């Protein structure tokens, strides 16, 4: 009898704290991690490395199908490794991000990457970080969490991150951008950003990250009977 590895899906809007929560869960439980938001960016780098035409859906599909990528967490730091090389910084390049949005428009590439994401499911378990992990990618996951926070709080968090990196930022502009993205994500025709029907909805607006982690762990342990 084949035992299917459990999955904990963490969905939610940008700035809600998904990344921090997922890293903490992966380290605490010693499970695998999937950062779905990085997948398309990694594919762009792989295409550049292998001189595959970015505008060729036919050429990108086999590359997406066999994408050699893994996500490693150590002491709260996430490393994205492509073909043995740490590309954590390279995927944050603005050009890479813009190109990733372009290739995401290819239906067959999306389908290939959907299958590739599902292949991350392996023992002892998987923490899946994204926007449609519980609704589209792993609809059978036993533990689904939708992490949310007010748009004001998410804009404030983003502002602090940018300021810590030395950038001058305008809060109102950040807030406007976040609200616009929320509207797009929640009203798109394919895989809208909504909690799965059986997801635990956690509002992190007035919670510390330690409180969020504790609530998520307690929920997962109750469902999965983890020690």
From Swiss-Prot:
InterPro entries: Cytidylate_kin, Cytidylate_kinase_dom, P-loop_NTPase. Signal peptide: none annotated. It holds the Pfam family Cytidylate_kin. It is found in: Cytoplasm. ATP binds at residues 12-20. Its EC number is 2.7.4.25. This is Cytidylate kinase. It comes from Sodalis glossinidius (strain morsitans).
């Amino acid at each position: 009898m084949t035992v299917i590895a459990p999955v904990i899906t963490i969905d939610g809007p940008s700035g809600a704290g998904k990344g921090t929560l997922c890293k903490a869960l992966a380290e605490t439980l010693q499970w695998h991690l999937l950062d779905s938001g990085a997948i398309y960016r990694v594919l762009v780098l792989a295409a550049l490395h292998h001189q595959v035409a970015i505008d060729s859906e036919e050429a990108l599909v086999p590359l997406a199908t066999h994408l050699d990528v893994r996500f490693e967490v150590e002491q709260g730091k996430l490393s994205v490794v492509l073909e043995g090389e740490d590309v954590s910084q390279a995927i944050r390049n603005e050009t890479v991000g813009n190109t990733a949005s372009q290739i995401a428009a290819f239906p067959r590439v999306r389908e290939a990457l959907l299958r590739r994401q599902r292949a991350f499911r392996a023992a002892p378990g998987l923490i899946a970080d994204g926007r449609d992990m519980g609704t589209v990618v792993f609809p059978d996951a036993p533990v689904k969490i939708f992490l949310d926070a007010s748009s004001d709080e998410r804009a404030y968090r983003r502002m602090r991150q940018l300021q810590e990196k030395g950038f001058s930022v305008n809060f109102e502009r950040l807030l406007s951008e976040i609200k616009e993205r929320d509207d797009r994500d929640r009203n798109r025709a394919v895989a809208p950003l909504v909690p799965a029907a059986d997801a635990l909805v956690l509002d992190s607006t007035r919670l510390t990250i330690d409180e969020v982690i504790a609530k998520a762990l307690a929920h997962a342990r109750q469902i999965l009977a983890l020690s």
